[in-house]
């Protein structure tokens, strides 16, 4: 097929914004369009989105990206989707109307129910089947909450009238006007309902959470032609041929395609993923075992550490307490002081993720004196992101009994040179920043393009990976060790805080 003058459209549906990016055959960004959407916090610990607003903003940026590039449908070879994971949407199979707001991955309303499951002895069984720890983070308890708490919904679900999907499923449903009800293995692996060994929905877990199997989408590989669009956005059908959760898409976009390669994404949260190859490695250190991707019949597995609050702590400094006017000033502020002034910021604003998994931890700023300035607080917030990533890296090293050669990084925050240098200093490891920062979208584009032959194979993709900068450790090792000791003291103070 002739792909001359054709582009791949990547849909990158994130936690705070919807984006659409057009890539050319060299993996270069042609245009990018982005639109934020409303975050809803109905109660403390609750986080919701409006599914219709997700679709409205996503369809809007698709049109904007195409208009910016002055391209028509005939210039789009295929579409790839990357999405925020775990976020749970339930809608009516006939009308397509959501029955409740999307419950976002950060939402903690089911924390007490998760504790009940642990006390009933389900932790090991769920770990063996799904690779996951029991936590409100994943979709299963969110689905159950909607079925149990929204009037009339359980009865409708049992009559087969409702669909559940993560955001990828919702987008494909909308792109095909309800003709396709599918997900991919990476998104399925984050529901706590999917058996990562059999690659099937697990009936025992469906029974545990009292979720009717009829609600669940068909599970597909990450790179295959699923369908063609049938939405007014496009005048003709365009193949939808790649799909993965955002962190797995970023791992693929970074071309961490060999065992032992590792990447960290700095977004709303921070997510470190290590490619473990063809076999799942069950963590002994509170990490998640997940599916990296499935190409054809071959499934690749990964270890993941999820940090709930990464870049969101900077958002909180700006919007929550008005300490900074914008995110870009944080690098300058952090560098304006020689150290953190003894201040440690544990950004457990929605609990602590890996490796602590403390749903009742809360944010803490410790070590404040009369000499503490806004610059110290800002620096402590950035350092807090890096310390959390360090804790995940140590858990990974203990699981695989090896140190990574380097950490590839992506996400909006990696433009912050202070953050990247401090990360290298603390981890005692090179931090590698690529030329293309939009690796989540690039991964979705690669998966879609491979399925239709736009790119021949992974070797062709490897030739496109391009380095921007390597950050090597500069801090003395004993200084790093002292900082980490203080950090771990601060974490201890923040744990088990909420009732």
UniProtKB/Swiss-Prot annotation:
It catalyses: glycerol + ATP = sn-glycerol 3-phosphate + ADP + H(+). Gene3D superfamilies: 3.30.420.40. ATP binds at residues 15-17, 268, 311, 315, 412. Sn-glycerol 3-phosphate binds at residues 15, 85-86, 137, 246. ADP binds at residues 15, 19, 268, 311, 412, 416. Keywords: ATP-binding, Glycerol metabolism, Kinase, Nucleotide-binding, Transferase. SUPFAM superfamilies: Actin-like ATPase domain (SSF53067). GO terms for biological process: glycerol catabolic process; glycerol metabolic process; glycerol-3-phosphate metabolic process. It comes from the Bacteria. One of its GO terms (molecular function) is ATP binding. Its EC number is 2.7.1.30. Pathway: Polyol metabolism; glycerol degradation via glycerol kinase pathway; sn-glycerol 3-phosphate from glycerol: step 1/1. GO terms for cellular component: cytosol. It is an enzyme of class 2 (transferase). Glycerol binds at residues 85-86, 137, 246-247. Inhibited by fructose 1,6-bisphosphate (FBP). Key enzyme in the regulation of glycerol uptake and metabolism. Catalyzes the phosphorylation of glycerol to yield sn-glycerol 3-phosphate. Belongs to the FGGY kinase family. This is Glycerol kinase. It comes from Parabacteroides distasonis (strain ATCC 8503 / DSM 20701 / CIP 104284 / JCM 5825 / NCTC 11152).
């Amino acid at each position: 097929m002739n792909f001359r003058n054709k582009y791949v459209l990547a849909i990158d549906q994130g936690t705070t914004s919807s984006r659409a990016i057009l890539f050319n055959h060299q993996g270069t960004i042609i245009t990018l369009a982005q639109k934020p959407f409303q975050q809803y916090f109905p109660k403390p610990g609750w986080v919701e989105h409006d599914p219709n607003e997700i679709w409205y903003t996503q369809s809007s940026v698709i049109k904007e990206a195409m208009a910016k590039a002055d391209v028509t449908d005939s210039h789009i070879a295929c579409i790839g989707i990357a999405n925020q994971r775990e976020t749970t949407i339930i809608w009516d199979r006939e009308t397509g109307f959501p029955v409740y707001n999307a419950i976002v991955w950060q939402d903690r309303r089911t924390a007490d129910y998760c504790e009940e499951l642990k006390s009933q002895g389900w932790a090991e069984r769920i770990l063996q089947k799904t690779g996951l720890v029991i936590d409100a983070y994943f979709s299963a308890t969110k689905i159950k909450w909607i079925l149990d708490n929204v009037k009339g919904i359980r009865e409708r679900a049992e009559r087969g009238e409702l669909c559940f999907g993560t955001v990828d499923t919702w987008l494909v449903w909308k792109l095909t006007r309800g003709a396709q009800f599918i997900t991919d293995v990476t998104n399925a692996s984050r529901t706590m309902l999917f058996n990562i060994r059999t690659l099937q929905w697990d009936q025992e877990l469906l029974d545990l959470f009292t979720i009717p199997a009829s609600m669940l989408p068909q599970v597909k590989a990450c790179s295959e032609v699923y369908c063609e669009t049938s939405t007014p956005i496009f005048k003709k059908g365009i193949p939808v041929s790649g799909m993965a959760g955002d962190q797995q898409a970023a791992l693929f976009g970074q071309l961490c395609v060999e065992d032992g390669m590792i990447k960290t994404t700095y977004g709303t949260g921070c997510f470190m993923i290590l490619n473990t190859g063809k076999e799942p490695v069950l963590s002994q250190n509170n990490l998640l075992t997940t599916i990296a991707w499935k190409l054809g019949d071959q499934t690749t597995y990964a270890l993941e550490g999820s940090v709930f609050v990464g870049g969101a702590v900077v958002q909180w400094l700006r919007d929550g307490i008005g300490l900074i006017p914008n995110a870009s000033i944080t690098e300058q502020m952090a560098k304006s002081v020689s150290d953190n002034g003894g201040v440690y910021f544990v950004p457990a604003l929605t609990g602590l993720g890996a490796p602590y998994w403390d749903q009742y931890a809360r944010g803490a700023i410790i070590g404040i004196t009369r000499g503490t300035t806004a610059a110290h607080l800002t620096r402590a917030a950035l350092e807090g992101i890096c310390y959390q990533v360090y804790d995940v890296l140590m858990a990974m090293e203990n699981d695989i009994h090896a140190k990574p050669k380097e950490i590839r990084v992506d996400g909006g925050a990696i433009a912050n040179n202070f953050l990247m240098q401090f990360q290298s200093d603390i981890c005692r490891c090179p931090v590698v920043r690529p030329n293309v920062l939009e690796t989540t979208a690039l991964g979705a584009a690669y998966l879609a393009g491979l399925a239709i032959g736009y790119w021949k194979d992974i070797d062709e993709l490897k030739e496109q990976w391009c380095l921007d900068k390597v950050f090597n450790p500069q801090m003395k090792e004993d200084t790093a060790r002292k900082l980490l000791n203080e950090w771990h003291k601060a974490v201890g103070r923040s744990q088990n805080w909420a009732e």
